[in-house]
Amino acid sequence: MAPSQKRKAIDDDFILTISDNEEDIPLEEEQEVVPRKKAKTATQQSNKQKKKNNKKSKKQQQTEDDDDEAETKEDDAADLGIWGDNDEDDGAMDTEFQFVVDGQNEVDAEFDGWGFEGAHKGVVKGANAGGDKKAVDIDEIIRRRRERKAAKEGKTTATKEEEDKMEVDEEEDDIEEIDVDLDDDEDGVLADDAFGMGVGSDVEEEEEKQDAKMGGVDGEDEDSEGEDGEKKGEDEDEGDASDDDSVATAVEHPDDVQSSDDEEGIDEEEEAKMKEFFAPEEENQPKKKGEMSSFQEMSLSRPILRGLTSVGFTKPTPIQAKTIPISLMGKDVVGGAVTGSGKTAAFVVPILERLLYRPKKVPTTRVVILTPTRELAIQCHAVAVKLASHTDIKFCLAVGGLSLKVQEAELRLRPDVVIATPGRFIDHMRNSASFAVDTIEILVLDEADRMLEDGFADELNEILTTLPKSRQTMLFSATMTSSVDRLIRAGLNKPVRIMADSQKKTAGTLVQEFVRLRPGRESKREGYLLHICKTIYTERVIIFFRQKKIAHKMRIIFGLFGLSCAELHGSMNQAQRIQSVEDFRDGKVNFLLATDLASRGLDIKGVDTVINYEAPQTPEIYVHRVGRTARAGRSGTAITLAAEPDRKVVKAAVKAGKSQGAKISSRIIDPADADKWQAEIDELEDEIEEIMQEEKEEKQLQNMEMQVKKGENMIKYEDEISSRPKRTWFETQEDKKKAKAAGRAELNGVRDKLKSKNEGKLSNKDRKKLDTMQERKQERTYKKGSAERAGKGAVLNLKKVVKKVGRSAGPKKKGGNAGKGGKGKGRRK
């Protein structure tokens, strides 16, 4: 019949396309998904062929093959998984993507922290162009000096050995040949004993003594920490008198009083300004958006979720949960949260989500992120690149110290996001022809409280007046200011205020310790610091200083005492600064000696301890300094050497910590130990000066070589250099100096400003003005002591004396007058 013939034809065609060996089936046929109906049809055909016994042997053999294939397909059809046939990935969804990450620790273990890869391109190109200078290696200078010293001592040793040999030769002539050989060997051994082995044994004995003392000191420190509950009250009672007596003394930083007053309460006028300036509270708390427990609930795109998973972010922090939904709406944001809480991701994630839906036909720069320091910008660039690793979003890093040509080439490609410092951004904005800012849609100010200070006022004003006014602006900081007058500078439009934590709050896992330096012992800071670094905290430590010269001096001292360290401050070029951070991050050095350049935003994994060589100028800087440890839920310790000039900041930090339930304790260090280390440092004072002088000479030599190279290039490439357009700036050198002085005055207070006017000295007139101003600011200028409270004080005795004199003076006066004339009342009677 016709139908049967057609069916046979189909079978014949089907048979001819199948090979005898199933392993040789082409890949395209293997990837095809076979529907269930087709599998059932093949089964019915094979069953019909089984019932026919009059088929040829060849046909029967083929039917058995069809049987096996049909059974396999039937089983596959019954066991079809989520991917289709054979339960394998058909390419519809990436197998590496995970909606719920169970093994969070495994993800975190793979991520080693943020690197500075984004800055290496600019550094390398700058070095090739002759813009980079070699750093003077302090360790190399110390090594050379020790080698010279050892060689000198070796010559003296050789001279003494020759004299000894001559004496032996004269006394023992009979056994000259034998004894000379023996004496040579013995003298060699004795010389080694005298100059090598003896010194080594002395050093070992000293080290053993130090180790024994170390154990004792550690034990005492632990005991003192354990007895804080008992002894702390006594120390505070004893310290109250000294603190109260010193209330009227000169304090270097009177601005701290104003900051504490601002913290205690906001006046009604400022509160009214805030209500008018910020968005209403109802908009700050949308429905359940502040309570999101995972990034999946935020409806983020898959590439963004994959980027978050790659860096180990599985659960949003409070600032992220509150900020991301509001930022996606396009509203202006003023955000604040504790250090190490993920503020960078809080503004990077919504930016990436919005950029995924941008028009891609014409590349355009749409986002600008500004930071106050270069290191923070480099780190922010690393975070953004890592989170956007599964997208096509492009970034450009534009900071000072790196090659201008490399940055101009990247800006010519019109990247989606530019991460920059204010100065370099203005430079490109004015002098790079291919860089346009009229298409900017989002502006972010990281560490905004620092950016809004007087030091950045002119630069920030230049940027804000150039950018489009219809932009979205976001401000973030751990110590976000509440001053509306400052926030107005950023050009915000009804911003949403999001404070995930109270202002100036430290991490809950941070232990804060304070070492009190009694009056007269401020000069022993170096000894205290060396004792701490040698015996208590020996690795993964960041030490903060106020001044670059002190940080550099301690770098030399640490090198002389065999402590591996690196320094980080503004006098270093960018290549040296990056190298220092990377050496500390990779564990090549145990100590990082830094100024406040590294206090903001720097996220280095595994920092165990932060030491403040002296308290910073303000409580806000203290919060940022100690925030370099105890990040992202990890534990950490911050120890501060506090003397009388640091009293204001320390009191503010302790007060804020106690109100938040932070762990605060006082560490007691034996003054004898500090004096011992200080004495050793004082002995090396001449050597320290010589090392600094040798370093200065090497720098001068390098500078001369650079000037010679520059002159050669000026002659060789004169036409090319003269044809370049001159770079312009928006303010003169005088304006730059004024802005710098204003920033320094705001940071260090009025006293330092007056010092700079008088070349480091205060006149008596200025000193009296400052003392009078500080007396007016004090809440109380006098407090009764223990004697007055017990009724035995000088004031009470003075009152008794006055009363006694008043009573006795009256009768004497009357009696005296009467007696002189001899006509008193008694006489008359």
Swiss-Prot record:
Q: Which residues form the Helicase ATP-binding domain?
A: 324-498
Top EC class of this enzyme: hydrolase
Q: Which GO terms describe its molecular function?
A: ATP binding; ATP hydrolysis activity; RNA binding; RNA helicase activity
**Annotated stretches, region: Disordered:** 1-96, 145-295, 728-829
Task: Name the residue ranges with Acidic residues bias.
Answer: 20-32, 63-78, 164-190, 218-228, 235-246, 258-271
Q: Where is the composition biased (Basic residues)?
A: 48-59, 800-815
Q motif, short sequence motif: residues? 293-321
GO biological process terms, semicolon-separated: ribosomal large subunit assembly; rRNA processing
Its recorded reaction(s) are:
ATP + H2O = ADP + phosphate + H(+)
According to its UniProt entry, what is the function of this protein? ATP-binding RNA helicase involved in ribosome assembly.
Q: What is its quaternary makeup? A: Associates with pre-ribosomal particles.
Query: What does UniProt say about this protein's domains?
Result: The Q motif is unique to and characteristic of the DEAD box family of RNA helicases and controls ATP binding and hydrolysis.
The entry's protein name is ATP-dependent RNA helicase drs1
* UniProt source species: Neurospora crassa (strain ATCC 24698 / 74-OR23-1A / CBS 708.71 / DSM 1257 / FGSC 987)
